[in-house]
Amino acid sequence: MNGSSAFHIILSVTFMVFLFGGLCEAGVVVNVDIINDIGPNVQLGLHCKSKDKDLGPQSLAPQQHWGFRKTLDFWGVTLFFCHFEWENQSKWFDILVAGRDRNTCAEHPCVWSIRPSGPCRLTGKEKCFPWNDQY
């Protein structure tokens, strides 16, 4: 076997390992559940989308849930963001980020409590996040 053939074999094997390793990760399905914890008697409007999928506007009464299910993409860059509105507030948050949520939310629903101070992920150890900067 000459050097060129060995190089092509090594390159092919490396590519296959990368390809199949990535495919194993790509099958991760995440269920996102959003809860209106803004406060008593406060309706929460929300609108979630990704760069290519619009989930439409929703309206949640206090303590009401709404959610969606998403298979993470091959490259691990899935991103869904939501716009939240209540009373005189308008906030944005990246509700599903593959790199942040894959491990925590792969086996259990990714439950988000939406609070005035920011969204808190209840899955696993509770962790609160700041709202996205307003553009």
From Swiss-Prot:
One of its GO terms (cellular component) is extracellular region. Pfam families: Self-incomp_S1. It comes from the Eukaryota. Keywords: Glycoprotein, Secreted, Self-incompatibility, Signal. It is found in: Secreted. Glycans are attached at residue 88. One of its GO terms (biological process) is rejection of self pollen. Residues 1-26 form the signal peptide. Transmembrane segments: none annotated. Belongs to the plant self-incompatibility (S1) protein family. This is S-protein homolog 20. It comes from Arabidopsis thaliana. The gene is SPH20.
